[in-house]
């Protein structure tokens, strides 16, 4: 894979420093400006404070970029041009048309693996959408998690999804799901989902050993680490479900499908909750980035 590295990321790779990949769909499509830019900066700062180097991924004028300069991140955040939401399947088109866009979980997993970066932080992964038995809307993220040796840190799957079916598909794909200090799957805005987890890691060193065993010893694909969102900004699950049901009904009436569902959901949920979901999203992004930075350092130390 032909990647363009920022100078900071290139130096970190050459020096063997721990790195954490970041997706940018949340910047280009997921959050409003200027909250999206503030979130990107906060995540990068959390990673640096943990002792690792942030490596945001994006497609800039057809180039697959690992590590962004400030003007490039601002370009994605301001959205003054048409920005693609780039998943793995979209690489060829984005490159050939010299497009610019934010990367999803699947795209970031592939780019991180190609760059030799073993840890990636995001808000929540994609998965099986509600009503998938009718429209078969299933994210590429799960296939990427199964394929690429990257430790993905998240607050569970996005709330809009069918969480039980997403967990079943992760199991079918052979992706281990690890609860970080929890026995229950977090559900993005909420600390719980009612879905028990089989595996748990109570400290970063244990989490790092699991990743190293999977990547180095077994030569297998990714690991999913689920971190409960901060308690002070999390929302009750039943409250979130009521808003999701109403928002999805609105999306259906408006004919919103596929990639457009999640940005619509995030925007409408923020309106319905008076900004509570936006606050929760910003907090969990930074919280995940902090743990990912610690995990990257522990992974490097274990080597």
UniProtKB/Swiss-Prot annotation:
Gene Ontology CC entries for this record: cytoplasm
Enzyme class label: lyase
GO terms (BP aspect): nucleobase catabolic process
Cofactor binding, note field: Binds 1 Mn(2+) ion per subunit.
Annotated substrate binding sites: 85, 105, 139-141
Similarity comment: Belongs to the pseudouridine-5'-phosphate glycosidase family.
Transmembrane regions listed in the UniProt entry: none
Enzyme Commission code: 4.2.1.70
Positions with a binding annotation for Mn(2+): 137
InterPro entries: Indigdn_synthA-like, PsuG
Catalytic residues in the record: 23 (proton donor), 158 (nucleophile)
Catalytic activity: D-ribose 5-phosphate + uracil = psi-UMP + H2O
Gene Ontology molecular functions: hydrolase activity, acting on glycosyl bonds; metal ion binding; pseudouridylate synthase activity
Cofactor(s) the protein requires to work: Mn(2+)
Protein name according to UniProt: Pseudouridine-5'-phosphate glycosidase
Function statement: Catalyzes the reversible cleavage of pseudouridine 5'-phosphate (PsiMP) to ribose 5-phosphate and uracil. Functions biologically in the cleavage direction, as part of a pseudouridine degradation pathway.
Assembly and interaction partners: Homotrimer.
PANTHER family: CARBOHYDRATE KINASE PFKB DOMAIN-CONTAINING PROTEIN, ZGC:136858
Keyword list, A-Z: Glycosidase, Hydrolase, Lyase, Manganese, Metal-binding
């Amino acid at each position: 894979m032909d990647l363009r590295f920022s100078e900071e990321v290139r130096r970190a790779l050459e020096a063997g420093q721990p790195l954490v990949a970041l997706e940018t769909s949340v910047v280009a499509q997921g959050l409003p400006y200027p909250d999206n830019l503030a979130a990107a900066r906060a995540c990068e700062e959390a990673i640096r404070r943990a002792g690792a180097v942030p490596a945001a991924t994006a497609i800039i004028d057809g180039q697959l970029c690992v590590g962004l300069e400030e003007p490039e991140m601002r370009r994605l955040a301001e959205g003054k041009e048409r920005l693609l939401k780039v998943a793995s399947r979209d690489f060829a088109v984005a490159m050939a048309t010299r497009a610019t866009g934010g990367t999803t979980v699947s795209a970031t997993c592939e780019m991180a693996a190609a760059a030799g970066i073993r840890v990636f932080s995001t808000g929540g992964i994609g998965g099986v959408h509600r009503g998938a038995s009718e429209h078969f809307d299933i994210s590429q993220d799960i296939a990427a998690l199964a394929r690429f040796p990257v430790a993905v840190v998240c607050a569970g799957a996005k709330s809009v999804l069918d969480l039980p079916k997403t967990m079943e598909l992760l199991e079918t794909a052979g992706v281990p799901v690890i609860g970080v200090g929890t026995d229950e799957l977090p559900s993005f805005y909420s600390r719980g989902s009612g879905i028990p987890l089989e595996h748990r890691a109570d400290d970063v060193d244990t989490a790092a050993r699991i990743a190293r065993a999977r990547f180095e010893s077994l030569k297998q694909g990714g690991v999913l680490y689920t971190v409960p969102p901060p308690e002070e900004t999390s929302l009750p699950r039943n409250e979130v479900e009521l808003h999701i049901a109403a928002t999805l009904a609105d999306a259906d009436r408006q004919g919103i499908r596929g990639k457009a569902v999640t940005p619509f959901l995030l925007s409408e949920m923020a309106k319905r909750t008076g900004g509570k979901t936006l606050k929760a999203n910003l907090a969990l992004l930074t919280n995940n980035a902090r743990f990912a930075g610690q995990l990257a350092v522990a992974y490097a130390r274990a080597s």
